[in-house]
Amino acid sequence: MMILSILATVVLLGALFYHRVSLFISSLILLAWTAALGVAGLWSAWVLVPLAIILVPFNFAPMRKSMISAPVFRGFRKVMPPMSRTEKEAIDAGTTWWEGDLFQGKPDWKKLHNYPQPRLTAEEQAFLDGPVEEACRMANDFQITHELADLPPELWAYLKEHRFFAMIIKKEYGGLEFSAYAQSRVLQKLSGVSGILAITVGVPNSLGPGELLQHYGTDEQKDHYLPRLARGQEIPCFALTSPEAGSDAGAIPDTGIVCMGEWQGQQVLGMRLTWNKRYITLAPIATVLGLAFKLSDPEKLLGGAEDLGITCALIPTTTPGVEIGRRHFPLNVPFQNGPTRGKDVFVPIDYIIGGPKMAGQGWRMLVECLSVGRGITLPSNSTGGVKSVALATGAYAHIRRQFKISIGKMEGIEEPLARIAGNAYVMDAAASLITYGIMLGEKPAVLSAIVKYHCTHRGQQSIIDAMDITGGKGIMLGQSNFLARAYQGAPIAITVEGANILTRSMMIFGQGAIRCHPYVLEEMEAAKNNDVNAFDKLLFKHIGHVGSNKVRSFWLGLTRGLTSSTPTGDATKRYYQHLNRLSANLALLSDVSMAVLGGSLKRRERISARLGDILSQLYLASAVLKRYDDEGRNEADLPLVHWGVQDALYQAEQAMDDLLQNFPNRVVAGLLNVVIFPTGRHYLAPSDKLDHKVAKILQVPNATRSRIGRGQYLTPSEHNPVGLLEEALVDVIAADPIHQRICKELGKNLPFTRLDELAHNALVKGLIDKDEAAILVKAEESRLRSINVDDFDPEELATKPVKLPEKVRKVEAA
């Protein structure tokens, strides 16, 4: 009985930790339990004495602080990692949303499902159906990329006329003031037609002068610039990146010095600016330049510190000394992007966004707005491109035949095709969910990094898969190619707004560990403020949090989550339970990693990356489940849901295993392995059988396939190869049963080629009627158009004569 009572006590302790019962209530329960065991004669009643001696200091604050919290506080202050001003501003900026629940070990799934699904307003829907549809019709991506290296003038004029650059600008200034969800849908539709078109529209609606002015501009700046930006009268760009400082914005060498100078014939207080920027989208054609630089005030003309820090200013590009106009050439996707320079350019102090009072506040301004832009533009562009590619590749896989069968029926093709379909579904879910948060007023900095990384990364992988499937069709550039420019340009999205390697290895968990953790940020603030009282309360909440996640990790691992609560009892029930387990695992691993590695965790980037991977996969899986719920839990969509969640579970568990295999403290790693994997690993990647179901969805018209491609531009036209493939798929499917009937009548397995000749012969023999013959003829036209590629006169490929150096010309002439 003694052994059973000890086991029961251990179970009771575990239950108290599991359910996160408060320290005081837990102490009372333990005392009552021990007293009950004493009365029952199982334990000596004297056990209450040492137990009370142990519990009293924990529950009596003065004793607890002096005996426990104060020594821990002193040690914590010593090991707390140093934080630069830019790091602190990045962490302080923005808010925590759903990722906070995932990080804390006990997600509230009902809260997730209660977030309202965004809807387009009548005005937003009309814009998508009207101006966006027309802009897609006007865009000829081959002309844009190969012949003009720019949007045609009439398309530029159309975008300005219909205020495409003003989606984020408020109506009081003449803007459209669209929701984040509407912006995402616009960009997805545009990106399915032309990456350059989507980038050109997306950048002014992301982080730039318009966004910064609305949040921080003076009334005079807003009244002057915002109506002009809304009309397209001003073209903005924002220059942050320097040759010497790419992702490390805090190290920009560009400078500004506060001084007196001449401006329009008068002596005024201003700044003398010197900068050298590159990779700046819209810089070659910009009329107003947003500029980030480090401002100093050596003469203290502003009355404050000498070193003011990063500052943002708005400068007309007609200002003497401003250099723009030259272009970079990014991977044959020639959107307007280039360098800008200036040396000792004098501008008035009022050019600072927000006026002189905002001097030195530039980095805070940027990071507070960056999460919104990063969370919408890049994920939407990648997602829209993949959605269109998914439909087109699925159609092509059905239309293209080898060995007398559609290549889409071959298992070797099914594997990458399933990844494309699954990623399209997951990416759209992830890109949509973050817009929910933004529309609720959140600025989810960590989520924006997650969505930026995973949408662009999965987008690139999907494009590579599509290229493998389409083969020669994908390689040959021309009007009929729907893939090659996306393939060439995929690294652009990977690189910009925080290169993906940096985002994964430093930003996601680097910010998430502090921003999303329920106690760490407040503990750091308490340590910084030397507030031992606040630290004491946080410390014991933190200890309870760690204990809870340790117990939850072990128990949920032992039971594979079967005992945890879920919001539903259908086919997705087990997924919520698995995610409950992984959330507890992440919380435990995060706390142990921070405790064991301390400040060195910042330098252990691969450990940080794997912790970020776990958080990311939890978000992606929850986004899939949220999408499935929002769309009415259509059972036909379950193969995509299964694929998306199973892939996320597998990758999250793989990241945990890799982390433990490489954790520097092997003893701690061994103990964690027992707690997290008490019965070993369990999650498998999507099976071949599931891949078959998912790949099949893309190859025939159906409601699930339509939901994958929702909102994309699918009108068949000369310049829309995706729309033409959609039309061809319908034509070929209509011809299939007629072809099979002819084969049966003739007793032959005829190839699905030369359908026009087959139609003629079958009509003559009376095997089909005229309508059926017309279907076969149309299918053959569509089939050939789909599988053929473009060819050119040699002179067409050299759009401009090459200017050779004089010496080379002389040699050739000789």
UniProtKB/Swiss-Prot annotation:
GO terms for molecular function: acyl-CoA dehydrogenase activity; flavin adenine dinucleotide binding; long-chain fatty acyl-CoA dehydrogenase activity; medium-chain fatty acyl-CoA dehydrogenase activity. Gene3D superfamilies: Acyl-CoA dehydrogenase/oxidase, N-terminal domain, Butyryl-CoA Dehydrogenase, subunit A, domain 2, Butyryl-CoA Dehydrogenase, subunit A, domain 3. The active site is at residue 497. GO terms for cellular component: cytoplasm. Pfam families: ACDH_C (PF09317), Acyl-CoA_dh_1 (PF00441), Acyl-CoA_dh_M (PF02770), Acyl-CoA_dh_N (PF02771). Keywords: FAD, Fatty acid metabolism, Flavoprotein, Lipid metabolism, Oxidoreductase. InterPro entries: Acyl-CoA_dehydrogenase, Acyl-CoA_Oxase/DH_mid-dom, Acyl-CoA_Oxase/DH_mid-dom_sf, AcylCo_DH-like_C, AcylCo_DH/oxidase_C, AcylCoA_DH/ox_N, AcylCoA_DH/ox_N_sf, AcylCoA_DH/oxidase_NM_dom_sf. One of its GO terms (biological process) is fatty acid catabolic process. Disruption phenotype: Cells lacking this gene are unable to grow on octanoate, decanoate, dodecanoate, or oleate as the sole carbon and energy source, but grow well on acetate, while the wild-type strain can grow on acetate, dodecanoate, and oleate. Its cofactor is FAD. Its EC number is 1.3.8.7, 1.3.8.8. It catalyses: a medium-chain 2,3-saturated fatty acyl-CoA + oxidized [electron-transfer flavoprotein] + H(+) = a medium-chain (2E)-enoyl-CoA + reduced [electron-transfer flavoprotein]; a long-chain 2,3-saturated fatty acyl-CoA + oxidized [electron-transfer flavoprotein] + H(+) = a long-chain (2E)-enoyl-CoA + reduced [electron-transfer flavoprotein]. Pathway: Lipid metabolism; fatty acid beta-oxidation. Induction: Transcription of fadE is negatively regulated by FadR. Induced in the presence of fatty acids, in a FadR-dependent manner. Belongs to the acyl-CoA dehydrogenase family. Catalyzes the dehydrogenation of acyl-coenzymes A (acyl-CoAs) to 2-enoyl-CoAs, the first step of the beta-oxidation cycle of fatty acid degradation. Is required for E.coli to utilize dodecanoate or oleate as the sole carbon and energy source for growth. This is Acyl-coenzyme A dehydrogenase. It comes from Escherichia coli (strain K12). The lineage of its organism: Bacteria, Pseudomonadati, Pseudomonadota, Gammaproteobacteria, Enterobacterales.
